From Swiss-Prot:
It comes from the Bacteria. Pfam families: ACCA. The gene is accA. This is Acetyl-coenzyme A carboxylase carboxyl transferase subunit alpha. GO terms for cellular component: acetyl-CoA carboxylase complex. The lineage of its organism: Bacteria, Pseudomonadati, Pseudomonadota, Gammaproteobacteria, Thiotrichales. It comes from Francisella tularensis subsp. holarctica (strain LVS). Keywords: ATP-binding, Cytoplasm, Fatty acid biosynthesis, Fatty acid metabolism, Lipid biosynthesis, Lipid metabolism, Nucleotide-binding, Transferase. Acetyl-CoA carboxylase is a heterohexamer composed of biotin carboxyl carrier protein (AccB), biotin carboxylase (AccC) and two subunits each of ACCase subunit alpha (AccA) and ACCase subunit beta (AccD).
Amino acid sequence: MNYLDFESKIKEIEDKITSLSHVFEDEKTEAEIKKLSKKRLELMESTYSKLTDWQVVQLSRHPDRPYFKDLLPLIFTDFQELHGDRTFGDDLAVIGGLAKLNNKPVMVIGQEKGRDTKSKIKHNFGMMHPEGYRKALRLMKLAEKFNMPVVTFIDTPGAYPGIKAEERGQSEAIARNLLEMSALKVPVVCIVIGEGCSGGALGIGVGDRLLMLQYSYFATISPEGCASILHKTAEKASEVTQMMNITSGRLKELKIVDEVIPEPLGGAHRDYETTATNIRKAVAAELKILSEMTVEQRNSRRYDKLMSFGRFKEA
């Protein structure tokens, strides 16, 4: 397991527990492991109850954190991937298709970063091209045609900023998705599972309900980008994060985010199955409420929600 800087003391205890577990077990060893386990639990509860916003950002980027492809089979069944935007190509930074949630059909779409070097390159580190946003929109319109809810998973450092992406209309593709998603006639639930950065996240992030995993962030710019603009150096990222209001708890207070999905103690990377279960329950509950509304009620609420954004408040 990989550890972050602020987890060094936890690592020390867990290393001791691991080494002792390989020793011949006797009453003394068992007692020591029990003692260390209790100490570890207390330390973890203390550490994660007072995380700074920068530490939350670090957790959202944890190398072992579950990505969309990890969570997909744990939340949904009968997934059938659909490819391409029918215009240019198939962007592998986003994966989408038909699936079932608690035996009910849904259209699921998620950004995928990739785990190792090969898969990171394959999925372009989760940075979508215009054809990715157009593919996502094609699947959403298909879901609308067959009256299926849409569930999107957001995890990206931003839309791909390359020249080719700009030539193919990156800004138009994102803007088109904002327009179309705001008027979809089916329930739309969006979940930030890691990084939710800039227009890259917004392109699949407009819906009836926006949920966030506890240790994720949602921002117009990365902390490093903000620090580079304000202080001319990315090294000030930890300082500016505190005033950006980008973590799940702060965004819930500002009513940008509707619900915060709890993660296992220590973060989602410590228990994929519990994380997936929490997401599945939260999404199912939201879809149940939304499905009981008429199209007019949902769209009216969605409009009111979008219009409430942008109110000024001192950070």
